[in-house]
Amino acid sequence: MAKYQFQTEVNQLLKLIIHSMYSNKDIFLREIVSNASDALDKLKYLTVSDDKYKDVAFNPRIDISFNEEKKILSVQDSGIGMDEEDLTNNLGTIARSGTKAFIDMLSKNGSGSSDLIGQFGVGFYSAFMAASKIDVYTRKAAGNGKVLHWSSDGTNSYEIEELTEKSEAYCQYGFDKSETVGSVIEIHLNDDSKDYASRWKIDELIKKYSNHIAFPIYLHYVQTKYNKDGKAEGTENKVDQVNSASALWKRNKSELKKEDYNDFYKTISHDGTDPLMYVHTHAEGTQEYTTLFYVPRTAPFDMYQADYKSGVKLYVKRVFITDDDRELLPSYLRFIRGVIDSEDLPLNVSREILQQNRILETIKTQSVKKLLSEFKKLGDEAKKLEAKTEISDDEKETLEKWHDFVKSYNRPLKEGLYSDFANRDEIAEIIRFKSTADEGSGENKWTSFADYVQRMKPDQKSIYYISGSDEKNLRSSPLLEAYKKKGFEVLIMADDIDDIVIPAYGKYKDFELKSVSRAGSDEELGVDKEEAKKKEEAFKPVQEKIKKALEGRVKDVVLSKRLSDSPSCIVVDENDPSLQMERMMKAMGQGGGDFVKPILGE
């Protein structure tokens, strides 16, 4: 038996799981069953797309058995199986960047982080919450026929050996038949988890977490037989299918309840909370496809990581194709979880073909439009409810849903203004901003471009905004003084990407977007030109003195029209990057100390 050391990050993860995560131990079975389903999906795809697997008999099933006396719980699948390299890569290492940050997050969140294990793609390790030891028996489909045995108690190392015919597990799990492929996860339950070796506990958890797994799950158990007098007279082995095994997204919407949608979301997302909303679409006509999309209640932890994992699975006629294609939806919708199932794509479609496929491009285009339409609908509904003095409990839930949506997903949606030219006007109707008009109205008061335009002064020609990194500081900026006095509303933009996406968007309908921190944005303040000229002449000597004193530090010193109380302010030239942009670029190692010279207004 060869012994291997776990990767350092795996060791850290296992220590956290074993010693800190105990609040929701139930999810380990969900993760193991989900992995079994993935293994079946992979083999199903290969049997129809790869000649190497054409002779493999695909009999999809997941079998769960237990031994109450020995405290053993086993989950067996007839999926793709693993060879030695797979065992090392899948069960001995974590091949993702961001692992250290992920482990740090788990450390901080402690026992409340069990759901994140599956979301990061390492759900197998969650079984150590309930296990004193785990044995894995596996034979890879279309491989060399060997049965391998992986074993670990979760402390530092694992062992791999070839399983011989003399081994009890070899025959117990059917590996004596050459056509048996797939994997068995045998969990030796610790003393605190022995309740999981129970028919009723397993049945309850499968129905709760895995009912909508698309393959049949069978529970094996021993039932006591009783005579007519109620006395036990022996036992019999029983096997029951314990899940519905249907592709929920293919079912008619009228058949499904909210609970069905929520349960399926938890199955595919590894998230223990209900989703914020879902969008289920059946399209027929020149192309036939089904989509079921979810918006998570909490933003995915890797939403701002460069190697974020796609949350959308692609199927063709219910055959799983991939869950690792980030082109299925644009990156600004990377928080979406769900399923796309096409009736028209070829089953043997490759990743390269996917990127250029017109059918998939059409599905993507229509899906984006549908999602943006639903987001706008929710926002419009919330706006109506905010105007009401009394609302029902259901209306309150809708309002909270919208507030949560804005807090979590306003920022990534803004990216679409920059990257998605075809849908930027639709996105502009959804995104929200803080405003000088909502002073003291609470954290849930937001303004849309449409709201701003509705409140504009009759003679106002531009939409004004101020950008920076801190909302509180922006609200007290002297740059706002004259605009407030004039009664011009100013949008407060405190997201780090605002200075990139807003200038790129440039104009909402017929109204130009102008930053109050830029020279030339104060033309509408209505200063008397003759009066301004007199002041300019009077202050010229002072300006020259200040300019000389600040030589090399500022680009210019000018008389400002935008101040009413403060003696001076700093703005940037209309052709220069903003100060917020300068900070961002310096943080990325671009630009030196003299990157942008500001203009002093007095």
For the regions a protein language model found, what residue spans apply to each?
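GHKL (Bergerat-fold) ATPase N-terminal catalytic module, capturing the glycine-rich phosphate-binding loop
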Residues: M1-D191, D195-Y196, K457
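GHKL/Bergerat-fold ATPase module in large chromosome/replication-associated machines
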Residues: L116, I134-K177, N190-D195, W200-E602
